[in-house]
Structures are given as structure tokens and as C-alpha cells.
Design a protein with these regions (language model features):
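Juxtamembrane/disordered regions of integral membrane proteins
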Residues: 2-190
Length: 190
């Protein structure tokens, strides 16, 4: 049990906070995507070109869908945190911890299946096997090297998911602080 006295539920406020923190984390994640080519040692612009080839979605629409998905994840995270006493965000450090756990869950349940079952086979079929005219030889070599060293991508993306889950939890802790001000805490953290 995370608290001795319960605070009143405010679902509409929780949804608003979830939208806000999801958008904040989504924009922060998008800022990381702007430099992902350099961080992974790829030619400039290859990340978004690969998204277009793998999923058939234009980069601007992909950015919009990603930010919408992060807003939905923020709402779900805050609704679960409000309704499950163990994960109720009554302090900012607890928000950071539960956000990191939430980021790891999103990585495991959403990113890994999409990466392994959709993205890698689509890149292999559309780019590497068919020699797409949209990609230069240097870009195809970089993608081949990256897919062979796939663990680097998985570790990097796991790190990014946990970091931005922590940002989402931090922002939730800041915004929900007043709601749980009078809640008696057990060992000051939970």
C-alpha cells in the first residue's frame, strides 16, 4: 500500500496531465530523433528515409503520429498511476522511478515487436534485398552494418525509452505534487 489516506480521484485532471506530460516526453524524444543518425553513425537523414521505406509513412506524418502516440502513452501512464496505489505518484522521485518502469514496459511491449516483426523484415525486403533506388550504396552499407549489429540499436532504444519515461514521470511528479500534498507517506517515498 502506497499511502494511508486516499486522495479524491480526478480523472479529467489526470487525463489532462497525461496529455501534457506525454507531449513533453514526445517532443523531447523527437529532439533526440533529429540526431539519431549521428549517434548511430549513419549518413544524415537516413533514419527518416528508412521510416518512410519501412512503414510507407511520410516523415511529417510519422512525427505527428509519434507525438500522438506519446500523448496516449502519457494518459495511460497517469491513469494507471492514479488507479493503482502502488504506482501512485505522490512524490517526484517516485514519478521518475515509475516513469522509467513505464518506459521499459513500452520498450518491451511496443518497440521490440515493431522492430523485430515489422521494421527489420521491411528494411530487409524493401531496401537490402531489392536494392532500392532511393538509397545510395553508402546508405545501404550503413543499414546492413546496423542490422547485423542489431543489439546496438536495441540497447540504445531501451536507454532512450527509459530516459524519456523518466522525463514523463518527472513532469507528472511536478504537476501532481499539489494533489498529494496532504497524503501521509510511508517512509517518505511511497
Amino acid at each position: 500500500m502506497s499511502s494511508i489516506s486516499d486522495s479524491p480521484s480526478d480523472t479529467k485532471g489526470t487525463i489532462k496531465v497525461g496529455l501534457g506530460v506525454g507531449l513533453i516526453a514526445g517532443v523531447a524524444l523527437f529532439a533526440t530523433f533529429l540526431s539519431v543518425d549521428q549517434q548511430l553513425g549513419l549518413p544524415h537523414g537516413l533514419f527518416f528515409k528508412t521510416m518512410d521505406s519501412a512503414f510507407g509513412v511520410e516523415p511529417v506524418l510519422a512525427i505527428f503520429l509519434g507525438i500522438c502516440a506519446s500523448a496516449i502513452i502519457g494518459v495511460v501512464y497517469n491513469l494507471i498511476s492514479e488507479n493503482w496505489k502502488t504506482f501512485r505518484i505522490i512524490t517526484t522521485p517516485k514519478g521518475i522511478l515509475t516513469g522509467a518502469v513505464g518506459g521499459a514496459i513500452v520498450f518491451g511491449l511496443i518497440f521490440v515487436p515493431l522492430h523485430a516483426l515489422v521494421f527489420v523484415p521491411a528494411i530487409d525486403a524493401n531496401v537490402l534485398s531489392n536494392g532500392s533506388a532511393d538509397f545510395t550504396d553508402k546508405e545501404i552499407k550503413s543499414l546492413t552494418s546496423l542490422l547485423i549489429n542489431n543489439t546496438h540499436v536495441l540497447w540504445y532504444s531501451a536507454f532512450v525509452h527509459v530516459i524519456f519515461g523518466s522525463i514523463m514521470g518527472l513532469m507528472s511528479g511536478f504537476l501532481l505534487h499539489d494533489r498529494y500534498r496532504n497524503v501521509t507517506r510511508i517512509r517518505s517515498f511511497w
